[in-house]
């Protein structure tokens, strides 16, 4: 059941400011004052959209629930696939460590490699929505285009795998104020991350591991990539080496990786 959209306090304040600016102009306040306030407000909203972990534009899942923390669970999320050259290896490593993950997949990549998406589900992981095209201008899109990107991917994932995603992650984590009402209308939860390895830009597994493991704790949501991941000096996808060491470290710490849909 879809819930009625409730704007965040920031968006409510923004709407009030716009109304106040119009009222001020109507009673003769200087236009420059009203324009300055509106411009400053739009600057704040833009900055909020450029900050992936921001909650100013609406709900944004940064960590797992308290129950998941108490169960010593963490979530490994893997973005930008499926990639037939990388994803199968990632799945094998997860199997070897009896770990589960959530794969935020791009719709057009699922269309190109449906059998890889089906294998992700067959092995007990979840596939979540990462938009259809992973457009660089995603955060600049209007409501109709945003909705098309998301709905099309929901349909592709469902028709290909039989699984209906419950979570969405924006391309690069960027968004605008129009995204939150769309997600609520589709019963999707926005997810970002607690910490990321920057494995699309760094080819040194040790540096990536250090970023992921510093202050690592139960309830964390980690971000890695099977699509567009960097390659080591030996031309191996960096996520392969990172994931093996990360899962070994989690075991030593008594932490278990679960998919988002199975977290406590």
Regions flagged by a language model, labelled:
Residues 134-141, 229-233:
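A short acidic, helix-capping loop that chelates divalent metal ions and anchors anionic groups
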Residues 78-80, 105-107, 129-131, 169-172, ...:
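A cross-domain feature marking catalytic cores of carbohydrate-active enzymes
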Residues 145-150, 205-210, 236-243:
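Charged helix-capping and loop-helix junction motifs
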Residues 213-264:
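Catalytic grooves of carbohydrate-active enzymes
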Residues 49-138, 152, 156, 256:
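Active-site beta->alpha N-cap acidic-glycine motif
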Residues 1-63:
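N-terminal membrane-anchoring alpha-helices
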Residues 81-85, 105-113, 136-144, 169-177, ...:
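Acidic-and-aromatic substrate-binding clefts and catalytic sites of carbohydrate-active enzymes
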């Amino acid at each position: 059941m879809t819930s009625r959209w409730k704007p965040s306090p920031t968006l409510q304040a923004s709407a009030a400011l716009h109304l106040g600016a119009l009222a001020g102009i109507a009673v003769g306040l200087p236009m420059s004052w009203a324009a300055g306030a509106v411009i400053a407000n739009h600057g704040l909203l833009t900055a909020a959209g450029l900050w992936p972990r921001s909650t100013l534009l609406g709900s944004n899942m940064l960590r797992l629930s308290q129950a998941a923390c108490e169960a010593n669970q963490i979530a490994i999320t893997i973005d930008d696939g499926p990639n037939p050259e990388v994803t199968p290896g990632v799945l094998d490593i997860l199997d070897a460590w009896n770990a589960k993950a959530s794969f935020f997949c791009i719709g057009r990549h699922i269309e190109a490699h449906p059998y890889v998406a089906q294998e992700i589900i067959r092995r007990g992981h979840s596939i979540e929505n990462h938009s259809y095209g992973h457009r660089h201008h995603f955060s600049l899109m209007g409501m109709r285009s945003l909705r098309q990107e998301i709905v099309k991917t929901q349909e592709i994932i469902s028709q290909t795998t039989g699984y209906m995603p419950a979570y969405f992650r924006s391309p690069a984590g960027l968004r605008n104020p129009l995204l939150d009402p769309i997600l609520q209308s589709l019963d999707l939860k926005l997810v970002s991350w607690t910490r990321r390895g920057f494995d699309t830009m760094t080819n040194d597994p040790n540096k990536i591991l250090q970023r992921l493991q510093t202050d690592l704790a139960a309830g964390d949501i980690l971000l890695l990539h099977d699509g567009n991941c960097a390659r080591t000096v030996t031309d191996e996808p960096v996520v392969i080496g990172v994931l093996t060491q990360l899962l070994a470290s989690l075991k030593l710490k008594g932490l278990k990786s679960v998919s988002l849909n199975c977290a406590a």
